[in-house]
């Protein structure tokens, strides 16, 4: 089971850490850890130190490089989180929780990748 978000307390909201660990675990189990999402957007900028640790994200942006994983998320997110809403768009899959939106984007740009606390991968801006 993937537990990096919870064990590192990446976010102050334990619910969010648990959601992300659950999603990453499902992907790692089905496709392997080399296929895990890459954190991007404002949260990646916080991880990189561009934004303050006090920055309050309005959503969590993740890049999924494989179209197969996009299809998997379209089908599995409603089963994993039945109380939440999932919206499928051509460029992304969005999980609307009661407290934040988690967006799974198709890749559009190639960026260098770094590792937050040597564990969670994110795009460098």
Language-model region placement:
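Generic detector of bulky aromatic hydrophobic side chains
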Residues: 15-17, 54-59, 82, 107-109
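A short linear-motif detector with a strong N-terminal bias
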Residues: 16-18, 39-44, 81-84
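Active-site nucleotide-donor binding segment shared across nucleotidyl transfer reactions
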Residues: 24-60, 65-70
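Amphipathic alpha-helical segments
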Residues: 66-81
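Conserved catalytic core of two-metal-ion nucleotidyltransferases
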Residues: 77-119
